[in-house]
């Protein structure tokens, strides 16, 4: 499989997913972070559909690949910040932990906050997200198109609320309340545990997160009215083009599975 590194940048700002030394005070970073959380939660089915391939039907959930359940890993530092925002604001500074390797002549090293067990399909790794469910034989163009589109929708909705607010103090108050509401509504998508365990399958069901291991069932997300409206609104693909993509991917899956079955019988 592939690990697709994704982030956004802007002239004069650099990477918008760079938390800086005080991420709890970085409004741009927190806004994009929450927008991404919102997007992935609302469109987890589309992200899953974007990597629906015959090879992934065997790979996901095993072979050091993430499970078919889409979730987000943030790491301890961001988990703490998100929890504080949900409670009404960052009341204390959140600092990155360090490692003392026991050698006086060497400096303390920052503890890596990224996910190393590889069981999270969508993980924050320092200054970017990694989408880890794309198949090895698959182009990453369509998964990244889906991710860009769903985050664009999320940012569009956030900006629609914030842009009319011209007073600076009221703007920050509105932003803080908006981020708090986003976290409260979409925190179910956040998961830092073992994605391979049976307990996660049960927990995901309790959270009402989609668990779609089958390719055909996953591709059905492309045919929903929600998906057609999303891609048409942002002029990515038309409903007809989206339907064609569903038909083509379904046909490819059937052919690949048939070839595998016929080869096994030789």
Regions found by a protein language model. Give the residues of each.
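Acidic/histidine-rich catalytic neighborhood
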Residues: 2-31, 35, 71-72
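Beta-rich nucleic-acid/ligand-interaction surfaces
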Residues: 1-9, 55-62
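Acidic, glycine-enriched catalytic cores built around paired aspartates
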Residues: 23, 28, 39-266
């Amino acid at each position: 499989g592939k690990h697709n590194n994704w982030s956004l940048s802007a002239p004069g700002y650099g990477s918008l997913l760079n938390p800086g030394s005080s991420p709890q005070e970085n409004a741009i970073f927190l806004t994009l972070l929450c927008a991404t959380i919102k997007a992935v939660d609302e469109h987890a089915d589309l992200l899953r559909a974007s990597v629906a391939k015959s090879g992934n039907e065997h790979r996901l959930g095993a072979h050091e690949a993430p499970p078919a359940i889409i979730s987000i890993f943030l790491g301890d530092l961001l988990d703490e910040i998100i929890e504080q925002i949900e409670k009404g604001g960052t009341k204390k500074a959140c600092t990155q932990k360090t490692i003392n390797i026991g050698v006086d002549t060497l400096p303390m090293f920052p503890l890596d906050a990224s996910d190393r067990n590889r069981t999270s399909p969508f993980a924050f790794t320092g200054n970017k997200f990694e989408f880890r469910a794309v198949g090895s034989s698959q182009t990453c163009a369509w998964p990244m198109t889906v991710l860009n589109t769903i985050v664009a929708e999320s940012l569009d909705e956030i900006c629609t609320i914030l842009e009319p607010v011209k007073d600076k103090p009221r703007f920050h108050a509105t932003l803080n309340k908006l981020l708090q509401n986003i976290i409260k509504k979409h925190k179910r998508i956040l998961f830092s545990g073992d994605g391979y365990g049976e307990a996660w399958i049960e927990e995901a069901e309790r959270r009402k997160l989609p668990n779609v291991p089958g390719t055909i069932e996953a591709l059905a997300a492309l045919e929903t009215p929600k998906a057609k409206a999303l891609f048409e609104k942002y002029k990515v693909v038309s409903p007809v083009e989206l339907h064609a993509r569903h038909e083509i991917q379904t046909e490819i899956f059937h052919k690949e599975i048939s070839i595998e079955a016929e080869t096994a019988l030789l």
